[in-house]
Amino acid sequence: MHEQYSPREIEAAAQSHWDAQKSFVVSEQPGKDTFYCLSMFPYPSGKLHMGHVRNYTIGDVIARYQRMQGKNVLQPMGWDAFGMPAENAAMKNQVAPAKWTYENIAYMKSQLKSLGLAIDWTREVTTCKPDYYRWEQWLFTRLFEKGVIYRKNGTVNWDPVDQTVLANEQVIDGRGWRSGALIEKREIPMYYFKITAYADELLSSLDELDGWPEQVKTMQRNWIGKSFGADIVFDYDVASIGIDGQLKVYSTRPDTLMGATYVAVAAEHPLAQRAAESNPAIAAFIAECKAGSVAEADMATMEKKGLATGQFVIHPLTGDKLPVFVANYVLWGYGEGAVMAVPAHDERDFEFANKYDLPIKQVYTGEGKDYDASTWQDWYGDKAGLTTINSGKYDGLDFSAAFDAIVGDLEASAHGARKTQFRLRDWGISRQRYWGCPIPIIHCDSCGDVPVPEDQLPVVLPEDVVPDGAGSPLAKMPEFYECTCPKCGAPAKRETDTMDTFVESSWYFARYASPNYEGGMVDPQAANHWLPVDQYIGGIEHAILHLLYARFFHKLMRDEGLVSSNEPFKNLLTQGMVVAETYYRTLENGGKDWFNPADVEVERDAKAKVIGAKLKSDGLPVEIGGTEKMSKSKNNGVDPQDMIDAYGADTCRLFMMFASPPDMSCEWSDAGVEGANRFLRRVWRLAHGHVSAGLPGKLDVASLSDEQKAVRRAIHLAIKQASNDIGQHHKFNTAIAQVMTLMNVLEKAATATEQDRALVQEGLEIVTLLLAPITPHISHELWQRLGHADAVIDAQWPQVDESALVQDSLTLVVQVNGKLRGQIEVPASASREDVEAAARANENVLRFTEGLSIRKVIVVPGKLVNIVAN
């Protein structure tokens, strides 16, 4: 055994052993407990960042721990390989997205391997390969035929220069991020998943997910947004509108209908369009609305604007005429594209009414409540503790009674009905992009939209295309889109839109169970053997979209008979971000020039807080920006490869797991990395000294001295606490702290006798086993050096010897009037009276109680004695 810890050699040897033995290749073993551990797969952006390292190390620690519990563990990996970054890189570098993607995958795979992750690489999936996406095309055709996927017009952000649809994030101040052109709202045909058909189940089955963070479940509940209300129908005022008809709105507060003073419609609503025909101002306002963002978040924060159309509708209960406004805050794709406005009890309507001098009619009041129509107060929107006023026959009712009475009358007059509604909208998956999965539909003039037959799948995406950013490349390739109709044989046109890349990541977890299966999307037998995933790990930023879509897809696959479980992920761990300090200088134009922490020399105070910083290259000061998520934009990232090259993967892994609990942010610290490396060198040094003296004989537990019992107690206390920390709570940082505490004991332990050395042997074996999931390479080497023929990867997690934890005697602190005055050692079985007597008799305690009257003695069993005297 070398005297010096050499991570490069140790890690290469361990990884070589795992590869040769196929240590992580798993197959179904009926009768053996399974554990499916999955970290969210990466986008192949070019190289790993520290967020990846943290995510995959957390997963690996859990997977290795479960393997040591004797389970058959599956931990696969793949690549979420379609998406816009590849197209952007292709345009920048004039290279096909496929080439860029596959080169990135090769490099990132080598990085993942260098981390020593226990991954079954035989199950690797790459979502941009036809053998993967053919199966989502197959599912698409099945769902299209069932009506779960349908086609309709959808409103999108259209860039008239680049001739393409932009995501909301690509619209900056109303202009395209690349072209700078003013963005238009445009309606184009798109394909939709009918996720709303599963809204009730997606909501109710959240209650079954006991292993998910409550925060994530709450976010999903709010996103699905189940609400109880009513459809309310307002008859057209024929004199002002010119035609007969009805305006329908949905409201969660029909109880406030008597306070409605106007209605607002979206720019695309037929009433708005009708008004625009004869009113140029309305036509111009509609054009302005259409140029705005279609993002709900933007709608919430933008200035609310409206214009009176000159039209009126009839209040269904009072017969009053209510003016119709066209407003920029009403979305055509949501509900009926119209809302009833009750300014007195809705904050948005209140602001709008005050802006345009519209009536505000209070219909709720409460004891001690004063209503002021010029200033919004939060109670205006409450339901509880209020009663109706100014509502005619509905006066004096609480929320529930007013709701029932008003909806009852609306139903009786055919002007409304109770309705349960969801905030969730159907999932539009059409993308006018190249680098995505082709939508398997053929458009025929005679037959309409025809799914591509199964024997013609996959529809293969050509991989030699270099996009130029103007429109969809596929729409310019007759060799791709020209085809014949599968039904009638006539010339037809293939769909040139591709699928939202969230589709690929919505079912990959199931494909891992049978990645090479050619008989279907998944092999149901293999899928049901492994699924649901026992532990899923990923960032909180995926709480809604990815996790909701994956749950939806799992239910779609269940209904196709592919899986038998209802939910894809039993337990979810959302890891925190990796953050680091930031430094910058302000430029003349007001921008910021960010410097990497490695290029900055810092001055710290006694608490290690940065109080000064200067650039190493010129010695001049830089501004301290605080700690933020590692990112390219802030130039505060640390390349994992540099860390692995300098310290080894085990140091990297140990630091990541020790720096903070996995669900909290992890602050990068060079000193912390060096500390982790120092600790591993300590373990190596102790093991080297022990092994060099020759391995001892067997430990005789029955003949241990009190000092030896104390050492053995520390060993088994570490097992007990680390088992609880890793196995029950995923508190890897406190488990590592237990191992460090044990190391302190072992370094001081006696080595004079064979029994002493046998005890240190047991201690080192336990240190090795407890560290094995966290620092697997050094553990692999130490296990062999400690005399074991089997590899530590095949070892069992250590068991606690409860008898070792039993103490013959206890050391208790003795206080006098709350101040430490001595220590006593008493038998573990000592009575309260014996403990009190020993405390009173302590020499130092006698000195501090001399001449005082002892009023009472407080004994805290196993901890302390406090003598109160005056």
Curated annotation (Swiss-Prot):
Its EC number is 6.1.1.4. Keywords: Aminoacyl-tRNA synthetase, ATP-binding, Cytoplasm, Ligase, Nucleotide-binding, Protein biosynthesis. GO terms for biological process: leucyl-tRNA aminoacylation. It is found in: Cytoplasm. Transmembrane segments: none annotated. GO terms for molecular function: aminoacyl-tRNA deacylase activity; ATP binding; leucine-tRNA ligase activity. It comes from the Bacteria. Belongs to the class-I aminoacyl-tRNA synthetase family. This is Leucine--tRNA ligase. It comes from Ectopseudomonas mendocina (strain ymp) (Pseudomonas mendocina). The gene is leuS.
